[in-house]
Swiss-Prot record:
The gene is kasB. GO terms for cellular component: cytosol; peptidoglycan-based cell wall; plasma membrane. Changing residue 315 to D: Phosphomimetic mutant. Loss of acid-fast staining and reduced pathogenicity. It comes from Mycobacterium tuberculosis (strain ATCC 25618 / H37Rv). This is 3-oxoacyl-[acyl-carrier-protein] synthase 2. It catalyses: an ultra-long-chain di-unsaturated fatty acyl-[ACP] + malonyl-[ACP] + H(+) = a 3-oxo-ultra-long-chain di-unsaturated fatty acyl-[ACP] + holo-[ACP] + CO2; hexadecanoyl-[ACP] + malonyl-[ACP] + H(+) = 3-oxooctadecanoyl-[ACP] + holo-[ACP] + CO2. It is an enzyme of class 2 (transferase). One of its GO terms (biological process) is fatty acid elongation. Phosphorylated on Thr-313 and Thr-315. Phosphorylated in vitro by several Ser/Thr protein kinases (STPKs).
Length: 417
């Protein structure tokens, strides 16, 4: 068996820019402040399709912005929704990172998505049935192809070290960051724009998940209290729109340009359950191994981890499996655990990137927001979940977990800078 590689072999990689839009705010800093203030972005949905199809789920978290007014007419004509989101976020990211001068031959892009623009194809079929082939634009393919969001950013930034689009359900955003880190430490790039974007809340995804009966909360009378990760009485997740991008680069590259360094990204691991299409391995074996490998690749030990940003969607099986995965990997260590989907909802392909930024901010500010709606911790979940009030502390190293349908597991190790 090949000897396992540890972080001692890798160049240091750091986070130097962040951009995010969520159901709470249109930027990362405001989202962060509102999470610390125990605010929720989950509201009653007022979309016409809720009544039209009599959907059993009537709650969710829409973004607080549209992107159209931030783009030119030509851009609007050529871009689908995900490309508009990624383009706007990438421009904010570049500004946040100090508008750096970079060698484009050493710049890569890695942006994941889960559902992508699949619903746009459905809408195009409706137009085609009504008006025939002339209703289909010659720009249709480029507007709705899954890699469009990453490609649009890569073209604007003239990135030539690779453009990637991980599609791994709810782990897509985290996998995009993990793949970017891997390319940098392998020497294939000096810097990467990475993260995840996801489409709007729509009728068909709600109906599809709702028909599974075990994964979505129908607590429509209490939107803000509906998602209850790790609680004994949890009954499923809630959709919450989002998108997030990070700029990561070698520490040497960042220092050379005088960048504002927010945190270290120290290790990342990707595993798979090989168990079931939509259910996690209840023992959390391979999810736990992803955490273990991220720690090893970072050159750390399980006892070094002070904080875990949990995937924790609020489903019965998922939260229990993640609790076991964390315990499998960390043994007797009990880091402070946070479950942000209780406040922001689940943005599918974007959520791993959203929560990576939250992990970075927790390390930067040395405080963890409270998990909302945790009243009675499930007795089968042996975790130290932060609830009630924000918890200041001495947080040196953290893990961000992301898991997805299909058995996808991603764990990323971050460090305080």
């Amino acid at each position: 068996m090949t000897e396992l590689v540890t972080g001692k072999a890798f160049p240091y990689v750091v986070v130097t820019g962040i951009a995010m839009t969520t159901a709470l705010a249109t930027d990362a800093e405001t989202t962060w402040k509102l999470l610390l203030d125990r605010q929720s972005g989950i509201r009653t949905l007022d979309d016409p399709f809720v009544e039209e199809f009599d959907l059993p789920v009537r709650i969710g978290g829409h973004l607080l912005e549209e992107f159209d007014h931030q783009l030119t007419r030509i851009e609007l004509r050529r871009m689908g929704y995900l490309q508009r989101m990624s383009t706007v976020l990438s421009r904010r990211l570049w500004e946040n990172a100090g508008s750096p001068e970079v060698d484009t031959n050493r710049l890569m892009v890695s942006i994941g998505t889960g559902l992508g623009s699949a619903e746009e194809l459905v809408f195009s079929y409706d137009d085609m049935r009504a008006r025939g082939m002339k209703a289909v634009s010659p720009l249709t393919v480029q507007k709705y192809m899954p890699n469009g969001a990453a490609a649009a950013v890569g073209l604007e930034r003239h990135a030539k070290a690779g453009v990637m689009t991980p599609v791994s359900a709810c782990a897509s955003g985290a996998e995009a960051i993990a793949r970017a880190w891997q390319q940098i430490v392998l020497g294939e790039a000096d810097a990467a724009i990475c993260g995840g974007v996801e489409t709007r809340i729509e009728a068909v995804p709600i109906a599809g998940f709702a028909q599974m009966r075990i994964v979505m909360s129908t607590n429509n009378d209490d939107p803000a209290g509906a998602c209850r990760p790790f609680d004994r009485d949890r009954d499923g997740f809630v959709f919450g729109e989002g998108g997030a991008l990070l700029l990561i680069e070698t520490e040497e590259h960042a220092k050379a340009r005088g960048a504002n360094i927010l945190a270290r990204i120290m290790g990342a691991s990707i595993t798979s359950d090989g168990f079931h299409m939509v259910a996690p391995d209840p023992n959390g074996e391979r999810a736990g191994h992803a955490i273990t490998r991220a720690i090893q690749l970072a050159g750390l030990a399980p006892g070094d981890i002070d904080h875990v940003n949990a995937h924790a969607t609020g489903t019965q099986v998922g939260d229990l499996a993640e609790g076991r995965a964390i315990n499998n990997a960390l043994g007797g260590n009990r880091p402070a655990v946070y479950a942000p989907k209780s406040a922001l909802g689940h943005s599918v392909g974007a959520v791993g990137a959203v929560e990576s930024i939250l992990t970075v901010l927790a390390l930067r500010d040395q405080v963890i927001p409270p998990t909302l709606n945790l009243v009675n911790l499930d007795p089968e979940i042996d975790l130290d979940v932060v609830a009630g009030e924000p918890r200041p502390g001495n947080y040196r190293y953290a893990i961000n977990n992301s898991f997805g349908f299909g058995g996808h597991n991603v764990a990323i190790a971050f460090g305080r800078y």
